[in-house]
Amino acid sequence: MTDRLKGKTAIISGGATGMGGAASRLFAAEGAHVAIIDRNGNAAAETVRSIRDAGGEADHWTADVSEEDAVNAAVAGVEARYGAVNVLFNHAGTIVIKPFLETTVEEWDWLHAVNVRSMFLMTKAVLPKMIASGGGSIVCTSSISAVAATPMEVLYDTTKGAVHMFARAIAVEFRDRNIRCNAVCPGFIRTPHGLREVAELQALGVDVSDAAIAAQQGRIGEPEDVARAALYLASDESSFVNGAHLFVDNGFTAI
């Protein structure tokens, strides 16, 4: 590894498993003090143990990142331990897959809370000290679903469209205070979340077979593919990249 985040404090929401877990391990290997904020405390603790066993530095805070008090308490805990946050990876998210006319207001509100409000809360909590310490990098997990609609995913697609613009708007407002904010936009990825999405879509008659995915993006992506893209956006290697959407989809959205 090349110490691209050496000495930096990095919060990763949803950093216990899947793409978030891969990012937690990679960021730590690149020298960051990794703070995982995740509602799955057991999984977060296991990821922290694996990072420490590999010689990295990490800790975790158990919190529902859609709840303001929980977010503020977790961020305060991170700052008390490590100081100002230099990197924020807003990764926590989930999905609702069902025919639109069967969805409910409760599902709409819940999904927006997890996928969008969480980024608002995390970013708002981290920014004051990040700015005061000289700036930093924020990365938000969007999706190909922000620009490529999928049947049965109206609620999910809408949240990712919001994330797309959230990242860009934060970049524009805070650029002159040395804050960068970009979005990483995965295609179909081999995680529990991604494989559940594929299974549920297939059960509803949407063609996301191996052949269909191969035609759209060559192969199914791996969590590490997304983690490496997030690392680039988090690190100083992307110091002149701000308000961008980096698609990790092997050309899915280019076709």
Task: Describe each model-derived feature in a short phrase.
Residues 128, 172-176, 239:
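Alpha-helical segment proximal to the catalytic Tyr-Lys
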Residues 99-100, 107-109, 211:
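Substrate-binding pocket helix/loop in short-chain dehydrogenase/reductase
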Residues 123, 159, 167:
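Active-site helix of classical SDR
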Residues 143:
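Residue(s) in the substrate-gating loop at a strand-loop-helix junction
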Residues 89, 175, 180, 241-243:
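Short, small/polar-rich loop/turn modules that mediate ligand/substrate recognition or access, typified
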Residues 98-101, 148-154, 176-177, 218, ...:
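Active-site loop immediately N-terminal to the catalytic Tyr-X3-Lys motif
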Residues 120, 135, 219-248, 253:
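C-terminal substrate-recognition "lid" of short-chain dehydrogenase/reductases
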